[in-house]
Regions:
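Positively charged, helix-rich recognition surfaces that bind polyanionic ligands
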Residues: 2-218
Length: 218
């Protein structure tokens, strides 16, 4: 019987390898499509050309291939390490209502989060791994090691929450005692804490929580 837990979080930042790859694919094909669109405009062509359809199909195939490999890598890691539960953080409004600048908003819209989620759900069901989606609001702001209470975001609630720790620079989170932890790990642990799928007291003194392990997908 599997007893270990894997908490998975994909932080939507350019520096994150997974999303950087997706961004690059979209940017490359969008650049080509923009040139084709410019030619169409000059020639007053309104329909989608065969070349546009071809590059769109190629882009979608490449992204789907990458997502499939990413999902397979995650599930294989679970199987190889006797992990029986997978927790995936999500935010229902992270695309619809995000207001973080025009460039970042474009990147958020391009992220095929739902496709990755669906692939993980399918593979987890296939191999008997328990899969749970967990709402993740405030998990990047709260301090895991300080045990901050993590509220659920409500747009009707105007209350401002104060947390023990803070992000002091890109990728690094500082607790109230000055302990430094990788910001992505802090967020992932808070998602796991919010999910309540396991007692996390045994994790507080685990050294590997401070720094994440990077796994190459392709």
């Amino acid at each position: 019987m599997r007893r270990k837990i894997l908490c998975l979080i994909f932080v939507l930042k350019i520096r994150c390898k997974f999303y950087k790859t997706i961004f690059q694919l979209y940017q490359y094909y969008n650049k080509i499509n923009a040139k084709l669109q410019s030619i169409k405009d000059k020639q007053k062509i309104e329909r989608t050309t065969l070349r546009q359809k071809r590059i769109t199909r190629k882009r979608n195939n490449r992204i789907n291939d990458y997502l499939s490999k990413a999902a397979r890598t995650i599930v294989n890691y679970c199987l190889n390490n006797d992990i029986g539960k997978l927790v995936l953080g999500y935010n229902e409004d992270f695309q619809r209502n995000s207001n973080i600048g025009s460039i970042n908003n474009q990147n958020f819209v391009n992220i095929p989060y739902g496709k990755l989620r669906d692939k993980l759900i399918y593979l987890c069901k296939l191999y008997g791994i328990e899969f749970k989606l967990q709402e993740e609001s405030y998990t990047s702001k709260a301090s895991f090691f300080d045990g901050d209470e993590i509220p659920i975001y409500d747009k009707e609630n105007l209350q401002e929450y104060i947390f023990s720790g803070k992000r002091i620079k890109r990728g690094l989170y500082q607790t109230s005692t000055g302990k430094l932890i990788n910001a992505d790990c802090n967020g992932a642990l808070n998602i796991l804490r919010k999910s309540k799928v396991v007692d996390l007291r045994v994790l507080y003194n685990r050294g590997e929580l401070n720094t994440p392990k990077r796994i190459r997908v392709v």
